[in-house]
UniProtKB/Swiss-Prot annotation:
Species the sequence originates in: Metamycoplasma arthritidis (strain 158L3-1) (Mycoplasma arthritidis)
Name under which the protein is recorded: Lysine--tRNA ligase
Keyword Protein biosynthesis: yes
EC numbers, comma separated: 6.1.1.6
A molecular function GO annotation: magnesium ion binding
Keywords, alphabetical: Aminoacyl-tRNA synthetase, ATP-binding, Cytoplasm, Ligase, Magnesium, Metal-binding, Nucleotide-binding, Protein biosynthesis
Enzyme category, top tier: ligase
GO CC annotations on file: cytosol
Family: Belongs to the class-II aminoacyl-tRNA synthetase family.
Length: 490
């Protein structure tokens, strides 16, 4: 099918032809810049015009033309803009031809003297302009812009050109990830990489993406967590490890979920759930300190990051809310209780699943300020250490902010006999219809048989953390290329 162009798109293509007839390339090799707009601002912003011109600084500046104001072109750099003053009387014939065919969105290289306008704005007095790249599609106009969310996500490369705040969000995302690494590196954690393709499903309760490994003639999973290989490294004597990487879960898409996302998981020998709470609160505080923030507006609420994070027991919170001590229930009575509270019961449900459902229904919505919820049921925590005072529950905790889960942490199970029993229970759940249940990872059981020291482990969703610190309400706002339904590319 032949592609149809708008009138403006056709005009730009005609300009390419006109330039080529003048032996001027519309798509050129680079010209090495001597400065960036950021460097020019840093070096000359606080100087007077006369003092700047005395330095006789000739700059070669590359950038995208995003505006034209009389004799001035505005070039967009990495994080700032700079004006180019165009005096046609001072320019050669080739430059004049380029200017005649120039459009907003074109990428140029401007050479000239660094100076300031009479109103004190930095500029370059152009002595030469070269065309580096002709833009064939007009940018959205500055009045209407690119405002439709799906259009913005689908054409992120345009979004970051015309919406400066969006670009700043992703620059901040990169900075936050660097700060996370800095925090754990300072604590002598070792960053590692583990396989994305896994032969066994495990490490989290999630539905996987499945692929076929031709060379091995079998199905593999895109990892749903990095937990099991990282704990194998703890067995191997590394003691403190972390991994920042992509995770894949074949599940729904909403404001806080994307099938492909980034997580950090970290594991520390001779620690536990309480130590992981300390590390998790520590990384949040470290980021806040480095970004110089104390309070954030997130999901319509003001969150004070300087106060100690609260801690509540999941089972106690549910019992208090519904007026029933759920610790005293068996599976049968728990299922009866679920029906009383209009909770949909699955075939594999036990006491722990009911407690989790009651928590999600009644307690989650009350968790606004940063709160650790601990003491999860064993039924929903197959990799966590049992609570010694009541083995139906575990040393597991989650961090909630504004009703959303941000982190999941355990005192890790290091008993190979117990771990195998839990894997077998998970297999029973899988056979009963729970698609998120784990399989038996025999190699992990074998690793535990060699001996894993008492260990604390935690996973944090990077996107949710970045949503929090950038005060965004949707995960798509912090993913450069979020998943969207396919549309025609014509």
């Amino acid at each position: 099918m032949e592609r149809k162009f708008s009138e403006q798109e056709q005009v730009r293509r005609d300009k390419v032809t006109a330039l080529e007839k003048q032996n001027i390339r519309a798509f050129s090799q680079t010209i090495k810049p001597t400065h960036t707009s950021e460097e020019i601002h840093a070096n000359f912003a606080n100087k007077e015009r006369e003092d700047i011109e005395k330095t006789n600084t000739i700059a070669v500046l590359n950038g995208r033309v995003i505006a034209q104001r009389g004799p001035f072109l505005v070039l967009q750099g990495r994080s700032s803009t700079l004006q180019i003053y165009v005096d046609k009387k001072a320019l050669n014939e080739e430059t004049l031809i380029i200017l005649k065919q120039l459009d907003l969105g074109d990428i140029i290289s401007a050479t000239g003297l660094v100076s300031k306008t009479h109103t004190g704005e930095l500029m370059i007095k152009a002595s030469d302009i070269k065309l580096l790249t002709k833009s064939l599609i007009p940018l959205p106009d500055k009045f209407h812009g690119l405002v439709d969310r799906e259009d913005r996500y689908r054409h992120r490369y345009v979004d970051t050109i015309v919406n400066e705040d969006v670009k700043k969000t992703f620059i901040l995302r990169s900075k936050i990830i660097k700060l996370i690494r800095e925090y754990f590196d300072n604590l002598n954690f070792l960053e590692v990489d583990t396989p994305v393709l896994q032969p066994i499903l495990g490490g989290a309760a999630a539905k996987p993406f499945i692929t076929y490994y031709n060379a091995l003639n079998c199905n593999f999973y895109l990892r749903i967590a990095t937990e099991l290989p990282l704990k194998k490294l703890i067995v191997g004597g590394f003691e403190r490890v972390y991994e920042i990487g992509r995770i894949f879960r074949n599940e729904g898409i909403d404001t806080t979920h994307n099938p492909e996302f980034t997580s950090i998981e970290f594991y520390e020998a001779y620690s536990d759930m309480w130590g992981m709470m300390e590390r998790t609160e520590g990384v949040f505080r470290y980021i806040a300190e480095k970004l110089n923030v104390q309070k954030l507006n997130f999901a319509g609420k003001e969150i004070d990051i300087t106060k100690p994070f609260a801690k509540i027991n999941m089972v106690d919170a549910v019992s208090e809310k519904i007026g029933v001590n759920v610790r005293e229930l068996d599976d049968k009575k728990a299922l009866e209780l679920a029906k009383q509270h209009d909770i949909k019961v699955e075939k594999y449900f036990k006491l722990g699943h009911v407690i989790e459902a009651l928590f999600e229904k009644y307690i989650e919505e009350t968790l606004i300020q940063p709160t650790f919820v601990y003491g999860h049921p064993l039924d929903i925590s197959p990799l966590a250490f049992k609570d010694e005072s009541d083995p139906r529950f575990t040393q597991r905790a989650e961090l909630f902010i504004c009703t959303k889960e941000f982190a999941n942490m355990y005192t890790e199970l290091n008993d190979p006999f117990d771990q195998l029993q839990r894997f077998e229970a998970q297999l029973d759940e899988k056979n009963a219809g729970n698609e998120e249940a784990n399989e038996i990872d025999w190699d992990f059981v074998k690793a535990l048989e060699y001996g894993m020291p008492p260990t604390g482990g935690c996973g944090i969703g990077i996107e949710r953390l970045i949503m929090f610190f950038t005060e965004n309400d949707s995960i798509r706002e912090v993913l450069l290329f979020p998943q969207l339904k396919a549309v025609s590319q014509k």
